[in-house]
């Protein structure tokens, strides 16, 4: 019999298993869509547990020293292998034999120093080979000769001193060769002979200290269209020599950024006259002097970059010959500082006259003294002009400032950061095609009369944000009815509440920004007529008073009529109230920002019409309760919610529904775990809202329906009781009338002949009442006849005998019960006694009691030996106090008179 293992052995075996699992999980690759990512896992060998059908394997940022071919045999479908940022020092030829479909091989940032003829012998399908940032100092023989399909070869950041990568023709499909950041110092004839049959398009030689371009060094590269020699310390003379060597080539793009080209002249680019150069980058060269006709040899040039230079003077012939130029970048090209205007960089009149095809001109961040009458003359196709932070003394825009742009189809004009303080009437009258005007970040301080925009017939956007102050008038924008976007952020806006509204002439307005203006007074017609408005920014103002119910005249409904509004920003306005109809017309609203206000309790139906709401921001308010009746409609289709930093009251009544909604919603809730904290009650202070336990709240949930049912039943019962109490007689009356009109009053009785319908027993003092109410009934119904002592007793007959005879000849006996009856000796001793005795002897239910007063049962029994329980309910009648019930009483009496006498 085997003995069980000791407990501590089980314990340590469990720890070992856990350590193995944790170790393996720490080195777990991510596989998705046939792509395996094994990067940053500190791997020292190739994983052997990946799916065999992967096509991409990422092994970057590990500790691999080799790529053993045997380890890749199971991954024969690989097309991309990335082994960058490892410590691989050697490539084995069999690697590509194990990966016959490999197309991209990336081995950047490794320790490879040598490449043999056999290294890539089996890599015939390779299209990209990345070997940058290794230790390759020299290419011996022909390691790339079998790479017939290679398109891109990257050998940058190595120690190569020559561009010669082979001894025989090869790489016939190569299009990109990257050799930047090496130690190449000269380009001599024959170095590119190995590419004699190639289709090389781009050659990257940047950051090489090249000092010589030997004659014919590029002639082998017949299809070369792009050459980069950035940061190569090329001098003007060496640049001129380079251009001569590029003569009669297919060069189209030439990048010479960050060199030592401080001067260019008529001869600098002379060698390029036999080319079709379209792009030239001369940025960051500390260029000071641009001689006349410097670009005369470049008639095909379309893009010229001169940014980040220090040009001193632009003459009328500086751009001569650039008849096809479409884009000119002069950003930070004229940056010389001087306290004297005469020493500032100069732009002569007609300097741009040769640029007939120019469409884009960027002159940002320069130091021009101003704009002359003919500065931009000749730019007949200019569409985009950027002059941000370009002038040192452009304080006022006059009607002559842009005279030189008259007639050009300018669409965008950027004048930001120029310290402009005033816009005169008609300043833009020459720019009839302008669509976007940016005047932000200046020092404009004036009243807008509307004449400033005269002539802007096609304007779409005016940006005036971040200026000194702007005072509006009714006519401020009457000249620009086509305006769609108006930005007036942080301009100390004045007179916003003028009437009619300054924005009323803008029926096409789509975006309006009035934020950061400390606006406190606006009227309900401010946005009237802006039916196309989609975005409204009013944050960082002081509009709290407008929505208070205590506001004189009530809350100001300034959002009414904005039927197509999509985005509304009302943050930081101090709101502590929201009118119930504030958002009534905003049915297409998609985003509301009410953050950083003082909101606590919101009206229940405030969001009922926001059926399209996708984003709701209520952060940093005083909201304690999030209930379904308020937020349910708003949360229905929500994609983003921000209610951070609110003092939530973590009770069932306040947030139970909210917590349940959080647990089931797919809405993006910003920083839910950290900034949605309970404030009250004290035991939950600082506790995350999402962790609030709602299970105690659910205990009452099953009884909610029962509670509602009980409430409804109780209300119905109370209603019925009140109805019966106040109108029961009427209901009974109409019911009895309906029934007896169909069935009649008299029930079937045994065949007996009675002379009277009823004999009425009453006290002598009640005779007037009896006569008053019995006679009308007899007149109304001739078949009905009562026996009345004063009228129907036979003359000469003893009273007692007459009473007995009358009772015998009457079908019913009516007692008119009053206090008088209880005290009447004759009634008590004879009439009542005899009537009851006859009814008992004949086994009849023939007695009807009519109570004219409220007589307790015990008094009735004491005086007449009668109780109400001795008679049928329909034979006990009470005389009504209300006159309108008399008819109902008469009807009940007729029913009682017509009822059957038999007791069985």
UniProtKB/Swiss-Prot annotation:
Pfam families: LRR_6, LRR_8, TIR, Tlr3_TMD
Gene3D superfamilies according to UniProt: Ribonuclease Inhibitor, Toll/interleukin-1 receptor homology (TIR) domain
GO cellular component terms, A-Z: early endosome; endoplasmic reticulum membrane; endosome membrane; extracellular matrix; extracellular space
Post-translational modification: TLR3 signaling requires a proteolytic cleavage mediated by cathepsins CTSB and CTSH, the cleavage occurs between amino acids 252 and 346. The cleaved form of TLR3 is the predominant form found in endosomes.
Residues linked to a glycan: 53, 58, 71, 125, 197, 248, 253, 276, 292, 399, 637, 663, 668
Reported function: Key component of innate and adaptive immunity. TLRs (Toll-like receptors) control host immune response against pathogens through recognition of molecular patterns specific to microorganisms. TLR3 is a nucleotide-sensing TLR which is activated by double-stranded RNA, a sign of viral infection. Acts via the adapter TRIF/TICAM1, leading to NF-kappa-B activation, IRF3 nuclear translocation, cytokine secretion and the inflammatory response.
Protein's name in the database: Toll-like receptor 3
Gene: TLR3
